[in-house]
């Protein structure tokens, strides 16, 4: 822990991993009431480009080592209609993400609505406990300079 407090400043949007970084600071400030904060959740998007490649005359050939029986299994299972393996992986990432936010904002979170992936306007994020203050950057700097006695 630093003897000097760290400040995470959200300039219009602090979402997902960007919010996760800001949440590690001692104080989290958003620049205005319409700044968006949150999007705490995980997902994976997969694209099947097989048909597009075939239309271009490209044939994909994959050769795996005999021992690599699980290599890319969750991906191919999901592409073939069974996302359960990929879902387990995404859920594990999500659990770790939520645990980080809980630890970073310990004692400041007022409810669990932040865990759903929702984006909040700053005034709502303040009520939930995702941020500590709402003020413009120039005001934050002015206050810091005043505290540090810098003109």
Protein language model features and the residues they cover:
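C-terminal long alpha-helix characteristic of the crotonase
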Residues: 87-112, 122-123, 132-151
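A generic structural-conservation signal
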Residues: 8, 62, 134-135
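Short linear loop/turn motifs
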Residues: 65-71, 115-118, 138-143
